[in-house]
Amino acid sequence: MENICELFDDVILEIMNLLSDTDKINFMFCCSRFYYFIDLVYYNDIYDYYKIQNVSFINKFKKIRYLAVTDTIPSVITHLELDKSFVGSLENCQLPKLSCLKLTQLQYDSFKIYISPAVKIDILKLPTYLKYIDLDYSWDIETYSNSNNVIVKRLRTDFICPVENREGPKCGLMKTSCISTNYYSANYYQYINSQQTQLVTGKHHVPNIQTNKSVKQPIKYSSNTKSTINNIFTNILNNIPKNIPKYTPNNIPKIVPKNTHYRNSSKKYRY
């Protein structure tokens, strides 16, 4: 046989199913004869749901990945990851094709009775080092510690006293501060080690070391700038090393210079 197009359909289909997904597509675009099989072959790579949701032959994709923020989850999903801020429950989710599930330990503890034993579970682990510093809208500093220390997911501060010069390292007064974690448990709040405390409350810029994401612009505190920690975390405050100054919202006025000009913490002052 001189022309492969003259093969029977089932033979061509069998050949295509032996190819990688990329080769299948390239093969189909050779001519209209092969393009006919686009909705007949199976695709074996993992695809994001939002990229193929409007494809009429979505059932031909063997692995479909989806990041769920709510419990409205498509039934065709095979690889599911629950967002750390996931809202809802897996109780009423119909996921007959689900084979892999990635979630946090707390989420697993909450939903494990609704998870089929056949589903492969991947529980997210907390890293044991400073992961990255996000200097976007919220000025979040995300840190992590090992199991012997407090698990600080996010130190959130409001920047209300920007300097006149918007260029260079940012400095000013950090108005409020609160610690939260997606892995929350009262037992986690034990103490912050000296290295973490220095990263959070030090006078100098946060060093870009042991990170997997470069710092666009380091935060540099002025001599009158202190990071304040909400007094509801008294058990943390009591264990901060003595050489690290501790300030609560009640005594902030004592450290604010009299000539300080307060401005609205709008977006334009955060850049």
From Swiss-Prot:
Q: Locations of Basic residues compositional bias?
A: 260-271
- Give me the ranges of the annotated region Disordered: 251-271
F-box domain: which residues? Answer: 4-49
Give coiled-coil spans as residue ranges: none
Q: What Pfam families does UniProt report for this protein, alphabetically?
A: F-box (PF00646)
Q: Which InterPro entries match?
A: F-box_dom
| Protein name, entry field | Putative F-box protein L165
